[in-house]
């Protein structure tokens, strides 16, 4: 987290992106009719502040990104990371620290440890989406089940089951029987 794009989001303007070329929206609006009548209106891929990751970065060896729109410029993907199509997404200032399977969303400033799996539709909240500006770290060899959601750090070797949400204020209670079972296996 020593190099980051904190504050960039507020300073950058939305642009129309045609491939890796940004075009100012005000210029497009001012020239729209002339461009359309001359057949030169661009085929716009997206409107955003950041380009797509693969438009400017060559992914590390053994890294797979199955849809170019799923990783934003400013993300960091370690070698061996796989970003699947569908609900997968990695935002700027976010990324992986080793081989990670990404089938869910890694929001801004969230970091996922090696060997972890962000299950289909799972969400890791970012500094722009519900963490009060505190970056979330997911430990190594951790599973975030399908459609789970976390807005707080989770350590190594944890499982957040499918559909479960855990936030900084979430209270967790264990029965005496569950505590005894945990003591037995630990």
What is the meaning of each model-derived region?
Residues 131-135, 140-143, 149, 165, ...:
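C-terminal segments of enzyme domains that contribute to small-molecule binding surfaces
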Residues 47-54, 62, 68, 74, ...:
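Generic secondary-structure boundary/loop-capping signal
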Residues 2-6, 12, 30-32, 37, ...:
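Proteins with a high burden of low-complexity, intrinsically disordered sequence enriched in S/T/G/P/A and R
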Residues 63, 69-71, 75-77, 81-90, ...:
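A structural motif detector for beta-strand N-caps
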Residues 1-59:
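Terminal amphipathic alpha-helical/low-complexity segments used for targeting or macromolecular assembly
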Residues 55-64, 133-135:
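Short, positively charged
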Residues 24-39, 120-128, 147-152, 156, ...:
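Short, Lys/Arg-enriched charge-dense amphipathic segments
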